[in-house]
Structures are given as structure tokens and as C-alpha cells.
Amino acid sequence: MEEIKKICLFFLASLYYQYLAGQNIFIPMDDEQKNHLKAYGLTYWALSQDTKAEWLLNYRGGSFLLDGYSSIEKECKLRDISFQVISENDAQKLRNAIAKPSVNAEIVELLTPPKIAVYSPKTAQPWDDAVTLVLSYAEIPYDVIFDEEVLEEKLALYDWLHLHHEDFTGQYGKFWNSFKYAQWYKKQVQEAERMALKYGYKKVSQLKLAVAKRIRDFTLGGGFLFAMCSATDSYDIALSSDGIDFLDWMYDGDGIENDPQSKIDF
């Protein structure tokens, strides 16, 4: 009886993962795609199922070409993603067209899904984190990490790091003038100061500089970094002003050193 169960399970699994011989699944990413974010998530899911994908850069919005498994076709339907089943012959014609020197496009073969980390505070903020909202909707798995994980060398566990609303200079986004009495701002300052003390730093700016350096080392080691919003500027400013006190008293308790601007090395 047990042997029959195993045979049945194997048969069902083979049906689910049945390869559509000589066929491919084309996922357009131009205006014909009705659910772009879900399409990215579907491609990630396909990679996690040990299926390779071809990313057709600069072709119809960066479309995807996947192996023609019935399970992938089923997922496309479940996630309401626009797709086409095309023959291997048509897929090869597409590859040949993109490979022409006169065509400004490229094919990148994707083999494994990246392990993603999002650098974001664990506590609630008065704005939405666009990165986590997008990844959650797309059904792309990720971990939320912050200063503790970065300083404890856990960045090495990931392939891709996202930065969103963050001020690596220790000025809390320069919200002091407008929100210094807001409870969320006070709590943010208290938590940052507590974190700095925990890791032996006298100032939050020193803590954030240490985090920025760890992120720099992560990218030098081959890690991918995607920064947006205030993270793009403040990350560079923090690294460029190492050892320079350009923060006023409301941010670190003391004044600005003499002529800090002339000492910053971009």
C-alpha cells in the first residue's frame, strides 16, 4: 500500500512539473503586461524552483523567457500575469534578433534567486516603506535588517541589499526643525542613541558611519546595493566626512567644527 502511495505521489508531481516539450513561456514587460510587479515575483519563484530564466533587457520593457513548465503556466494564471506560450523555434528567432549588433538589447541568463535584505527600522514610521510594500506585493521573499545585523556581520548572508529612507549622517533626515516634538521623532532619536551606546559609540553619527562602511565593504565584496530616497546622498556624505564633525548641537550635543565643508572628501 505504501509503495502505491509513493507511485501516486510521483505521478502527481510529474504532472505538476511537466515540461511542455519544445515550448517556452514568454512574459512581456511592456504595456501588454497587466501585472508587472507580480511578473517579477513569478520570475523569482521560477528561479527558486530550479528553473532558469532569460531576462531580455531593453526588449519590450525587459521581458522574461522561461522554460515551458506547466507549473509556471499555472502560476502565471494564479497571479493574473500576462504571458504567452511560444515554440522553441520562435524563442530562438527572438534570441537571434536580440543578438544582432544593430539591436540595442541583451539577454541575461538568470540561474538562482538572490537572497534579499531590506535595511529598515524594525519600528513603525510615519511613512510607508515603498521597498517592502513592493516586494510583499510581488511575493518576493526578503528579510528586514537594521544596524544590529549590519554591525554583527550578517550582510554576508545576502546577495542584494535595499536602502530606502535612511540618513547615514546621523541627522535623522533633518526633521528636527519640523518634528522635534513629534513622538515618533523622539522615539527614533532615543532608539538610535541606545543603539550607538550598545556598540560603543558616543554619537549616532559614528554608529551610522560604521554601518555605511560595512555596506561599502559588502559592495566591494560583490554584493548588490540598491539605494533610493535619502539613502543615496547621506551614504556618500557619511563616508566622505569620516572624522569631520559637521553636525550641529541638536543632532549630536555639540557644535560644528571650524570650516567642515573644506575638509569633506568626496
Which residues make up each language-model segment?
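Hydrophobic targeting/anchoring helices
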Residues: 21-129, 138
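Sec/Tat-exported extracytoplasmic proteins
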Residues: 47-51, 120, 165, 222-223, ...
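Cleavable N-terminal signal peptides
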Residues: 10, 20-21
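Helical hinge/lid and interdomain linker segments adjacent to catalytic or ligand-binding clefts
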Residues: 25, 30-34, 64-65, 69-74, ...
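An acidic, glycine-rich "communication" segment
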Residues: 228-266
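Surface-exposed patches in mature extracellular/periplasmic domains of secreted proteins
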Residues: 53-59, 145-148, 248-252
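Positively charged n-region of N-terminal signal peptides that target proteins for export
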Residues: 1-6
